[in-house]
């Protein structure tokens, strides 16, 4: 069955999942539903401590069994140690058929890939997956399905009851013996615990894992004791030095700096760039560089940002410190500078993942965005974006807040080089659609800028800018002239993953890859 972005979704997947095809970003606006609830065992009179000696003890107390759903956050990014630690204990107990519901997974989780092969892990729900686990999914080694959701879509799935968490594990930089948790004040700080908030609220059991036990009460807390069942102290929950890895680094690449300068020129010419504008940037090098160059224009024009939101980086914190931004509302910190800012700056505020991007609450922060600056692996001539599946067909990225912010912002700008290596980034059709073209307004490459034709207002604002404006088809043709039109990735018939739209409908499917075969 064809959906609103032209992807054919197999009827079998619609039947098995009970989902509808994607019918547009705002198709479910105003739809009423009833939130799910956790199973709660009241603690009316206790001994005053929830401490347990080990993760194994916590698993046994939570009555771990085959077929359960376990959840984790990824605030430590590639420095996370909690997910692997817990799953090793699950494996030792001989538990099978586990669904992992993680806010994201990466190469730090490579050591548990064997648990996919032996049936310990049979389903994965995540923003995305990188590394060996992504490869295992694409090769069809996961017995069940991998469901990739945006950050907002994950909250929606949990609170609607579509995903019910049996046990949530929250790696907490500090905790007291009664379960008040904070992301700061310990030896492995991560700034915020935003992705754990829905898990704490809706999971049947919640286990805090910390390497820094502090006196009661741990105040201020980001996760309250009223949601936590048990606390376990371990040697090490994460390595903060590995938070700023991969995408989350500034750049000195001249091509990326050129695209950042184009981005600044676009932003400053739109009607939204005025005192009190709101802004989010991604963590790609060009996106971070665009924040730095935009600050010069803000100083020149005496324009101040009302709030910056989302994943926070050092340049955003520096805008706050300088007074160019009034407030930061934070769901994830991408470097140690941002972590320190979250702990010390009174105008740097923690918000939950639901407050940030949940499409099924009564209004998330993304709805109030003027600008969002994003990256993409691929953009097609329909302005659809792919941020999850690589050009080789392997799951190697994450939706993150990409679809959420694109849907909410008044001006969504996607920055991507015309080529990624020798692979065109602008193409006729993306390998997999993760963000629909209806939500993308401007595409910036190192060879020119394309404006979505439906945004005549932006075309008018930029027509005399002197910028290298081109149609999206022209950008594709430039890319193809350099490399030739690439061969399409060859997939098998089996669907191994689902790309969910943020509202829970099916945007696209991911099929099992098969060895490349040359045409006769």
Regions found by a protein language model. Give the residues of each.
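Conserved alpha/beta enzyme-core scaffold
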Residues: 1-520
């Amino acid at each position: 069955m064809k959906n609103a972005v032209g992807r054919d979704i197999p009827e079998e997947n619609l039947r098995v999942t009970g989902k509808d095809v994607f019918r547009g970003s705002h198709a479910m606006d105003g739809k009423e539903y009833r939130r799910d609830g956790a199973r709660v065992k009241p603690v009316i009179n206790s001994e005053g401590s929830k401490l347990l000696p080990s993760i194994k003890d916590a698993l046994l107390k939570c009555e771990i069994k085959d077929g359960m759903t376990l959840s984790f956050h990824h605030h430590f990014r590639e420095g996370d140690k909690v997910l692997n630690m817990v799953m090793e204990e699950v494996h030792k107990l001989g538990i099978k058929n586990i669904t992992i519901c993680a806010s994201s997974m990466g190469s730090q989780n490579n050591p548990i890939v064997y648990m996919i092969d032996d049936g310990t892990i049979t389903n994965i729900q995540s923003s995305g997956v990188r590394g060996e686990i992504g490869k295992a999914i694409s090769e069809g080694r996961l017995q069940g399905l991998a469901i990739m959701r945006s950050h907002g879509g994950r909250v929606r799935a949990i609170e609607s009851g579509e995903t019910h968490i049996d046990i949530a594990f929250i790696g907490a930089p500090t905790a007291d013996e009664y379960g008040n948790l904070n992301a700061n004040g310990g030896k492995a700080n991560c700034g915020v615990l935003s992705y754990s908030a829905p898990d704490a609220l809706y999971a049947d059991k919640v286990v805090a894992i910390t390497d820094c036990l502090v006196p009661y009460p741990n105040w201020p807390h980001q996760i309250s004791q009223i949601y936590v069942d048990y606390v376990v102290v371990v040697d090490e929950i994460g390595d903060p030095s590995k938070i700023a890895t991969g995408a989350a680094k500034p750049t000195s690449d001249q091509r990326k700096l050129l695209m950042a300068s184009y981005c600044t020129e676009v932003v400053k010419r739109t009607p939204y760039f005025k005192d009190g504008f709101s802004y989010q940037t991604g963590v790609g090098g060009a996106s971070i560089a665009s924040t730095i160059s935009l600050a010069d224009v803000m100083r020149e024009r005496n324009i101040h940002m009302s709030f910056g939101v989302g994943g926070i980086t050092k340049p955003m914190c520096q805008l706050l410190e300088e007074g160019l931004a009034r407030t930061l509302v934070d769901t994830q910190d991408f470097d140690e500078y941002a972590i320190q800012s979250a702990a010390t700056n009174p105008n740097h505020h923690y918000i939950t993942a639901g407050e940030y991007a949940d499409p099924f609450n009564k209004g998330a922060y993304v709805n109030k965005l003027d600008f969002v600056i994003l990256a993409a692996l691929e953009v097609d001539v329909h302005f659809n974006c792919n941020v999850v599946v690589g050009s080789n067909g392997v799951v190697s990225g994450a939706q993150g807040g990409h679809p959420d912010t694109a849907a909410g912002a008044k001006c969504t700008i996607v920055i991507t080089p015309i080529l990624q290596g020798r692979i065109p980034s602008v193409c006729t059709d993306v390998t997999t659609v993760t963000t629909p073209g209806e939500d993308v307004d401007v595409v910036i490459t190192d060879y020119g800028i394309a404006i979505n034709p439906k945004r005549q207002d932006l075309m008018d604002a930029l027509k005399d800018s002197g910028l290298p404006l081109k149609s999206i088809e022209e950008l594709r043709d430039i890319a193809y002239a350099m490399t030739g039109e690439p061969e399409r990735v060859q997939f098998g018939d089996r669907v191994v993953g689902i790309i969910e739209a943020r509202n829970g409908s099916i945007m696209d499917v991911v099929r099992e890859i098969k060895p490349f075969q040359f045409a006769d």
